[in-house]
Amino acid sequence: MPSLKEVQLKIKGVKQTKKITKAMNMVATSKLRGAQTNMEAFRPYAEKFAEVLGSLAAKAGEETSPLLVPKESVKRVNVVLCTSDRGLCGGFNTNLVRMANAYLKRCQEKEIEVSFTHFGKKGRDWCRKMTDCERKSEYLGVVGARFGFNVAVTAGRELINGFLNGDYDEVHVIYSEFQGMAKQLPVIRQLLPIPPIETADSPASDGGEDYLAEHICEPSPDEILDAMLPKNVFIQIYSALLETSTSEHAARMAAMDNASKACNDMINELTLLYNKARQAAITAELMDIVGGAEALKG
């Protein structure tokens, strides 16, 4: 059985750890509110933008933008991998890296070259360890922090230029979709060429939920579409970053809450062990006293 001093030191150490996990839980909770507010505020804009873009795509002529045209054969793919810069958030980064690794293996089986654009240190560090993983660009200090739309514009322009120049035939993004405080789902979506945008077959005339507005285009649908397609890429990247940031804070909040609970359980176990050790020490002292008294009598 460990000594009383050893148990006391262990209890003190666990209590210090609990203070840290509790503080990190509170910080993550605070950041989560802000990130979730930004994400939910941006969703209606992204949905309306997709609606207008789909309407324009349906009206556009036969001369289609190169951002919409799939390549005849896919030989090179770029993947935008969104992870966090820091750990201590449970399996958040592990799930994203696992999806990226699975996608990399599928592409290698088809003899497709894969390169990565990184948001976050965890994804970048994983790619550094892979001998067959080419890194294009990296953006650190973005996910989980305060960032503006200009970050998505910078990354989006680089991806669009690479796609138009033939550096890669497709661009995909892997990010964490926020589905609730206890559920963050890693997903992969195609950015380029821009996949077909679903629109309602026929606009409803009653103005209900399925109502699709008739968009009047000036100067022409083709010209407006050419201007909106790059912005659609920026919006998809920005939305992925918002979702990933919110998911990171939610995952860290849950991980630190579980860690604090584990600290409480450990403190209870160590306290019980301390009481047993203390009781054993007191019993031993009493036995010595009684033994000494009996020896004096004898």
Swiss-Prot record:
Gene Ontology, cellular component aspect: plasma membrane; proton-transporting ATP synthase complex
Any one GO molecular function term: ATP binding
GO-annotated biological processes: proton motive force-driven plasma membrane ATP synthesis
Domain of life, source organism: Bacteria
Membrane disposition: Peripheral membrane protein
Cell compartment(s), UniProt: Cell inner membrane
Keyword presence, Ion transport: yes
Chain segments annotated as transmembrane: none
Keywords: ATP synthesis, Cell inner membrane, Cell membrane, CF(1), Hydrogen ion transport, Ion transport, Membrane, Transport
Protein family (similarity comment): Belongs to the ATPase gamma chain family.
Subunit structure, as described in the record: F-type ATPases have 2 components, CF(1) - the catalytic core - and CF(0) - the membrane proton channel. CF(1) has five subunits: alpha(3), beta(3), gamma(1), delta(1), epsilon(1). CF(0) has three main subunits: a, b and c.
Role played: Produces ATP from ADP in the presence of a proton gradient across the membrane. The gamma chain is believed to be important in regulating ATPase activity and the flow of protons through the CF(0) complex.
Protein's recorded name: ATP synthase gamma chain
Organism listed in the record: Desulfosudis oleivorans (strain DSM 6200 / JCM 39069 / Hxd3)
